[in-house]
Amino acid sequence: MSLNFLEFEKPIAELEAKVEALREISRRGGENALDLEKEIKQLEDKCLELKKKTFSDLGAWEVAQLARHPERPYVLDYIEHMFTEFDELAGDRAFADDKALVGGIARLDGRPVMVIGHQKGRGTKEKVIRNFGMPKPEGYRKAKRLMQMAERFNMPVITFIDTAGAYPGVGAEERGQSEAIAMNLKIMSELSVPVICNVVGEGGSGGALAIGVGDYVNMLQYSTYSVISPEGCASILWRDSDKAPQAAEAMGLVAPRLKELELIDTIIDEPLGGAHRDHKATAENIKQRLLEQLKELDAFDNEALLERRYQRLMSYGYC
């Protein structure tokens, strides 16, 4: 897979390019092939050490860049690797079908579940169709419809959060964007089935929260969750979007800080270098955590499940 390298990854990219060049020479054969194998191994070891060093000490701004990586897996990638028999459901039964938010019935390890998530799209054409992963009110109303359907058929709800935010256009506001988000918060807090939310990329403000209320909230290691983007915060506080790195550090938008504040429950590890380097391994990590959490939630009856969720929500903030 051809990768887009971020600025802080460039030394890694240079080493990987050297390794690939030597491999190409080695593939051509010749009397020096065996000697090249030794040099390739040395470079690979050096590259691995550099990756470990680089990714062991990432700042909030670097994590924010990784969360937006164009090759990071989206909900449809997770559906492909984690679920079987996915049947997409469309439309909010009121206005339109929003392609920025995907949902449908699937099986997780044989168990029927409702899967809902943001889809940003790859390539210009798909990004436009998906509205860059920013849902309009009809997207959130579709999610509400699917969650209520899941409750009727006693299926757990699993969400994948990856959006810069809800679409702020005039039409979206006219059709009740804030009401659609608020209604989802209410519905999700009252569902009598297990709800597990996973922040897998950008968790942007109300657009993320609208499918982010659950019994468990998980975050991938290099995902973010905040009320505003670092650039937006910098523009408001300092009138300078170039100060986004400072804003990112101050906002506490990374998984360890949010876990410390008890705003999320679990941090799910990503492969070395980020989820974009190995979609399948990332999906497997999430799948195993979901299976563990569903097993735990199955021990609760409906009343106990709702009480647990209520207490979880009431624990947010400072008293």
From Swiss-Prot:
Keyword Transferase among UniProt keywords: yes
Gene Ontology molecular function: any one: ATP binding
Domain CoA carboxyltransferase C-terminal residues, every copy: 35-296
EC number: 2.1.3.15
Location(s), subcellular: Cytoplasm
Domain of life: Bacteria
Catalytic reaction equation(s): N(6)-carboxybiotinyl-L-lysyl-[protein] + acetyl-CoA = N(6)-biotinyl-L-lysyl-[protein] + malonyl-CoA
Similarity field: Belongs to the AccA family.
Summary of the function given for this chain in its UniProt record: Component of the acetyl coenzyme A carboxylase (ACC) complex. First, biotin carboxylase catalyzes the carboxylation of biotin on its carrier protein (BCCP) and then the CO(2) group is transferred by the carboxyltransferase to acetyl-CoA to form malonyl-CoA.
Protein name (database record): Acetyl-coenzyme A carboxylase carboxyl transferase subunit alpha
Organism in which the protein naturally occurs: Aliivibrio fischeri (strain ATCC 700601 / ES114)
Gene name of this polypeptide: accA
